[in-house]
Amino acid sequence: SQPDTQTAEQDFLTRHPDAVVFSPKKRQWGTQDDLTCAQWLWKKIIALYEHAAECDGEVVRPKEPNWTAWANEIRLMCVQDGRTHKQICEMYNRVSRDPFWCRNVLSPSKLREKWDELSLRLSPSVSTYTEKREDPYFKASYD
């Protein structure tokens, strides 16, 4: 079984030479940039837990993530969804400052799943737009 595992890993690395974390069996992998982005997200999440623990002694630090799965999800956000690592980090910065979303987006997969909703809800321009906008149809119906 050992030679088969080594062969599978070598074949995988031949197909994905920039993979620094990978699981040939699960077909998951990530580049160094994907892993770095995943680790940055983890640091932000740990900071949220540490802040919560200051107020509530029952809060326990979560276990380390599966780095291959996290880096793979980051890679998919870049490759399939067209996001950059910078955009991913900027979005998570906004998420981490929101009282609701910081509790509900605690992984790259959840960030990816909720991206469209988050980009609208957490966009600074949306709250400004809805506050300043006057809808003539709405106003006319109540005048």
Each model region followed by its residue ranges:
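Append "and, occasionally, other polyanion-binding protein interfaces
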Residues: S1-D143
